[in-house]
Structure formats: structure tokens, C-alpha cells
């Protein structure tokens, strides 16, 4: 039932059109958001949930854009983020005093992160928690060092990253190759 609350980016459609379309949904004032969340929590009113979800679709798109470098279709990343947003709306307790966006960021990132991990061959071939942490740390270090292009790392770059992450160079090389899709 909740999956129908958010419009999904059309894989055949234009991402820019989707981003334009979601801007048409108004952002909510704190009081209106609180009242809608109370209505949904009390009665399960899907109209209230729909308003809460659609008013936060820009947040999902913004968070999803941070995952562009993983080589996954951004429309699918946004769709997974939308699932996280809907889950956040379902679980949100307005009486705790926080705005929905603050709470939803965690659920959106969790849904997208899970999608990214499930989409990568390193996870499909059996991964452990340390490998998953290395996956995300490598992405962050490459971004910080300005190595966002999809190319193999030079031996110097590999040594630099391995030293910073305190892992063997072969792990950095292997993971980096998987991230650029040459596995």
C-alpha cells in the first residue's frame, strides 16, 4: 500500500523531468507536517502519508545524487531512496519533537546503502562487514583525493589509499576494479 505513495522515476524517462516534477510538490511548514504525521499515526490516513512523502522527494533526490559514482542507474537509486522515505513516514513519531526530514535521512540512506551493497558483485560473492566498510571508505577517500573518474588507480594512488585505510594494496586494487565495473 505504501509503495504507491511516491512517484517513481521512469527508467525510460528523463531524470531532469522527474526532478522538475518533484519540485511541484510543496514543502510543508513544521505545524502542517506535525498535523499530517499525527493524522497518519492515529488513523493511517493515506492522504496524509502521501503529502508527507511527496513533500520530501527532493530530499531523496539530493541524497541519491551522492551515490552517482557507484555506476548504478540513478533512477533506481532514487526509487530505493523513496522506499526508505516511505518507511520513515510509517515509523515517524511526531511527538518526539524532530522534523520528518531529520528522521527520514537515516531511512533513505539505509535503503540506498542496502541497494548499493546488494547491487555489487563483492557482496554477491560473499562479503563480510569489514569488506563492506572498506567499500564505503574507499569511495570516500577517492572522493576526498579527487579520484572520482572511472579509471584504474595508478600504483602510487593505490599505495596512498592503502596506507591511509591501513589495508593491503591488493584489496584496494581489487575493490577499485569492482567499483569501476572491470571485475
What do the predicted segments below correspond to?
Residues 1-4, 183:
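Short intrinsically disordered, low-complexity coil segments enriched in acidic
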Residues 3-125, 129-147, 160:
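Alpha-helical promoter-recognition and RNA polymerase-docking modules of transcription initiation factors
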Residues 142-183:
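Long, charge-dense, solvent-exposed interaction surfaces that engage phosphate-rich ligands
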Amino acid at each position: 500500500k505504501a509503495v504507491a505513495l511516491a512517484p517513481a522515476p521512469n527508467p525510460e524517462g528523463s531524470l531532469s523531468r522527474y526532478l522538475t516534477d518533484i519540485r511541484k510538490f510543496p514543502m510543508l511548514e513544521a505545524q502542517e507536517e506535525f498535523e499530517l504525521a499525527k493524522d497518519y499515526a492515529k488513523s493511517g490516513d493515506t492522504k496524509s502519508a502521501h503529502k508527507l512523502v511527496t513533500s520530501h522527494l527532493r530530499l531523496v533526490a539530493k541524497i541519491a545524487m551522492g551515490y552517482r559514482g557507484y555506476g548504478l542507474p540513478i533512477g533506481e537509486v532514487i526509487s530505493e531512496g523513496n522506499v526508505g522515505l516511505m518507511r520513515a513516514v510509517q515509523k515517524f513519531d511526531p511527538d518526539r519533537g524532530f522534523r520528518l526530514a531529520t528522521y527520514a535521512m537515516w531511512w533513505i540512506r539505509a535503503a540506498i546503502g542496502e541497494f548499493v551493497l546488494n547491487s555489487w558483485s563483492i557482496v554477491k560473492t560473499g562479503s563480510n562487514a569489514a569488506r563492506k566498510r572498506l567499500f564505503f571508505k574507499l569511495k570516500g577517500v577517492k572522493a576526498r583525493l579527487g579520484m572520482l573518474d572511472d579509471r584504474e588507480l595508478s600504483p602510487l594512488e593505490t599505495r596512498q589509499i592503502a596506507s591511509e585505510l591501513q589495508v593491503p594494496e591488493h584489496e584496494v586494487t581489487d575493490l577499485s576494479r569492482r567499483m569501476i565495473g572491470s571485475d
